[in-house]
Design a protein with these regions (language model features):
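Rossmann-like NAD(P)(H) cofactor-binding subdomain of soluble oxidoreductases
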Residues: 2-51
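Glycine-rich beta-alpha junction loops
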Residues: 19, 40-43, 97, 136-139, ...
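Internal alpha-helical scaffold of NAD(P)-dependent oxidoreductase catalytic cores
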Residues: 55-144
Length: 215
């Protein structure tokens, strides 16, 4: 359908969270494939729809523009200009690295959030009221992430093969942490916790931390 209506000078972009599949489809089916430059603005919230629009949503947030081997450099510059005009910081990235990076920084955290809520439900089936009443801090923040659109996240999980590797790595580290706690290994536990604190500090220094987190 796009092949019938697209003009020669038309610029197309998408804002999906995974890139491998959409780029494969684009390169296979679109005549003017060089007119399609894929984007991924790293901004959003757990709510969706026009009623939740936010004029400052992209302000000072990263937007990844996907760099392929064969591409129209003028179109990349034009798309970069567009994202910068609405406040984004632009970075170029190839589709393979994009899907690997965001399987860890975005997709895995959401998966963990969904599973944590399931775990909390399973452990409190008799005392659901208590679960809700005392969900301050950690669980409440995770529940915000788990409130994200389930259809969108189903598609993200199914379209990024890297999520399985991310889950395996997370499981490996979780089992390691479990053994440390079982063995009451004070030194190793403090080291793990301290290291996580340092990474958190680095994230803040890179201005990736905001009052209302974006995922």
């Amino acid at each position: 359908k796009l092949n019938k209506i697209l003009g020669v000078n038309c610029l197309i972009t998408d804002v999906g969270s995974t890139k491998k599949n959409i780029i494969k489809l684009k390169n296979k089916n679109l005549n003017m494939k060089l007119n399609w430059i894929s984007s991924h603005p790293i901004a959003g919230s757990e709510v969706s729809g026009p009623e939740h629009g936010n004029k400052n949503l992209f302000l000072n947030k990263w937007c990844v523009i996907i760099k392929e081997k064969k591409q129209n450099s003028k179109k990349i510059k034009l798309l970069s200009k567009f994202w910068k005009k609405i406040g984004s910081k632009v970075v170029l990235m190839n589709p393979v690295n994009h899907d690997k990076i965001f399987s860890i920084t975005s997709h895995l955290p959401h998966l963990i959030a969904y599973n944590l809520i399931k775990t909390a439900q399973d452990s409190q089936k008799v005392q659901r009221k208590n679960l809700i009443q005392y969900s301050a801090g950690g669980l409440r923040d995770f529940s915000r992430i788990a409130a994200s659109n389930e259809i969108m996240w189903r598609d993200i999980f199914f379209s990024n093969d890297n999520i399985i590797k991310a889950i395996n790595l997370f499981t490996k580290n979780l089992n390691s942490l479990k053994k440390i706690i079982q063995n009451k290994n004070n030194k190793k536990l403090l080291s793990r916790l301290s290291n996580s604190k340092k990474v958190r500090t680095q994230i803040v220094q890179l201005k990736q931390d905001v009052a209302k987190p974006d995922f």
